[in-house]
């Protein structure tokens, strides 16, 4: 109860020093008294945010904005509060105002991250990249930056740029399996040429010989594109020994056996795959079974 009374007294005191007829003061003409008021309400707002009293924090920060309408830090904190209150559009407006209020090249990394996430969630890819560029100007280029660029370009549908973002990072760390797998995924999705695709499979397996997903995909592609069926069977065999009930691996192994005219054994593995498959993965297995006479 005492907390509520204190808050009411605070607001009454605030209205007493801010007459309703007054215009918003300009930051250049802030008096010492107004500066003291600003600091008081600012720290009260910060405490309210810490205590998750966001509605109260919003009121206090609005009064801070009344005193300093172009204060970037206040606008940023208002954006955080609006987010916490579930007001996405208002939060975006506050963050963008905070960005514009600060001299070029001085926006905080936290503000840039907030704007980048908002732009990415709204498919505003150019704006998101601009924010990442500014982040990189403040911090050392790293895996997080490369990953962000890869994600933006991939979701934007710019596959070549996504691969370029990955390759740029791999120049710094050529053995990073995460980025090698990202690159492989893009090559698989875009139907890359066999030579380039197989080189990537081999590169990953040199670093991680027991990567079951890569072994499975490599084996399936090799078997279905005129490659060495025995080598495909060998790689696929590793996957089902490691995960004997994995329907995807069983399906691949069964289909490779079928391509080698071992249909009875192929049916055994395909039926086992179907038995272990969830509904979403059954269609391809059924097609393979129906193809075997």
Positions of PLM-derived features:
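Residue-level recognition of tetratricopeptide repeat
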Residues: 46, 80, 117, 151, ...
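Start-of-helix register in tetratricopeptide repeats
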Residues: 39, 73, 107-110, 144, ...
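Single-residue signature of alpha-solenoid repeat helices
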Residues: 57, 91, 128, 162, ...
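Conserved structural position within tetratricopeptide repeats
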Residues: 63-66, 99-103, 133-137, 170-171, ...
